[in-house]
Amino acid sequence: MNKVVLLCRPGFEKECAAEITDKAGQREIFGFARVKENAGYVIYECYQPDDGDKLIRELPFSSLIFARQWFVVGELLQHLPPEDRITPIVGMLQGVVEKGGELRVEVADTNESKELLKFCRKFTVPLRAVLRDAGGLANYETPKRPVVHVFFIAPGCCYTGYSYSNNNSPFYMGIPRLKFPADAPSRSTLKLEEAFHVFIPADEWDERLANGMWAVDLGACPGGWTYQLVKRNMWVYSVDNGPMAQSLMDTGQVTWLREDGFKFRPTRSNISWMVCDMVEKPAKVAALMAQWLVNGWCRETIFNLKLPMKKRYEEVSHNLAYIQAQLDEHGINAQIQARQLYHDREEVTVHVRRIWAAVGGRRDER
């Protein structure tokens, strides 16, 4: 099994392919990417037969920006007989994965795949039963075993394979299912909620997104991102020349500061979170974020980088490298992650967490 399927946002296949080719090459796992425009997935074909498994084991999934999910697969199964699609699929998986912890029958996230998705949901139940009898799946779902993937690209046409549950997306198709809150000021609120799910482990929410924390939202109007912070019972400085939603102001948790997010400087020294979703050149936003992190004005930040029309992967990589270089120069240890979220459009979302400073700084980081 020398192929790795990577699911991505339709229209971003080239970026996904450029990224996996680059990062696989850094680990001396060589191959080539098969790209079909607007397909919603990329296939990276390794030259060595066992390198697909090596890639999804050794390259941290969290280091990928444009992939929503990945799994290693064998050859394409074609012309599955409508009267018995299950037997060929089970046959392909035998000897490949044993006692899998979960079955996911998936498609790419495209309009053309919506009808196929309905079939996948119905097909999952009988396939799961037969796979359990054949030993391909454990008798109960467990996060400690590999995930079995069956990926349909057309009716009667699928790839079969697996991913490791400790190095994949926990979500079906790599998409968290979030519901838009009726009282939120804008749909952008779902970006920050999804970012929390993707970047912060669920068992750390109570500690890192805690009641009573202080936060800053740069470019806050009308308050989609502030809404998520208020919902977590934080005190928020919302910085924007535009007005905030009255419903947020009525909570008493929001202080609206009518000024430019690029010029604002915090007066408090105990700000845990700074979030930012401003429509501006990515280099300018990256420079501002680096300034906040280097000066210790916040402990963690989530921000969006708007993407140019061309060379998107190169642009994002350049901006992330700039932030890393600034942190290194000032002796600051930090974790940086970036992902094009489901609710992102022509942008990527970045999370940076300061861990400690090598030089004297904030007391909570020594």
From Swiss-Prot:
Biological process terms in GO annotation: methylation; rRNA processing
Compartments, record wording: Cytoplasm
Any single GO CC term annotated in Swiss-Prot or TrEMBL for this entry: cytoplasm
Catalytic center residues: 306
Catalytic activity: cytidine(2498) in 23S rRNA + S-adenosyl-L-methionine = 2'-O-methylcytidine(2498) in 23S rRNA + S-adenosyl-L-homocysteine + H(+)
Record's keyword annotation contains Transmembrane helix: no
InterPro entries: RlmM_FDX, RlmM_THUMP-like, RNA_MeTrfase_FtsJ_dom, rRNA_MeTrfase_M, SAM-dependent_MTases_sf
Enzyme Commission number(s): 2.1.1.186
Presence of the UniProt keyword Magnesium in the record: no
Alphabetical list of Pfam families matching this protein: FtsJ, RlmM_FDX, RLMM_N
SUPFAM superfamilies assigned: S-adenosyl-L-methionine-dependent methyltransferases (SSF53335)
Example GO molecular function: S-adenosylmethionine-dependent methyltransferase activity
Main localisation: cytoplasm
Binding residues for S-adenosyl-L-methionine: 188, 221-224, 240, 260, 277
This protein's UniProt keywords: Cytoplasm, Methyltransferase, rRNA processing, S-adenosyl-L-methionine, Transferase
Function: Catalyzes the 2'-O-methylation at nucleotide C2498 in 23S rRNA.
PANTHER family: RIBOSOMAL RNA LARGE SUBUNIT METHYLTRANSFERASE M, RIBOSOMAL RNA METHYLTRANSFERASE FTSJ DOMAIN-CONTAINING PROTEIN
Quaternary context: Monomer.
Similarity field: Belongs to the class I-like SAM-binding methyltransferase superfamily. RNA methyltransferase RlmE family. RlmM subfamily.
Name under which the protein is recorded: Ribosomal RNA large subunit methyltransferase M
Organism: Shigella dysenteriae serotype 1 (strain Sd197)
Annotated gene: rlmM
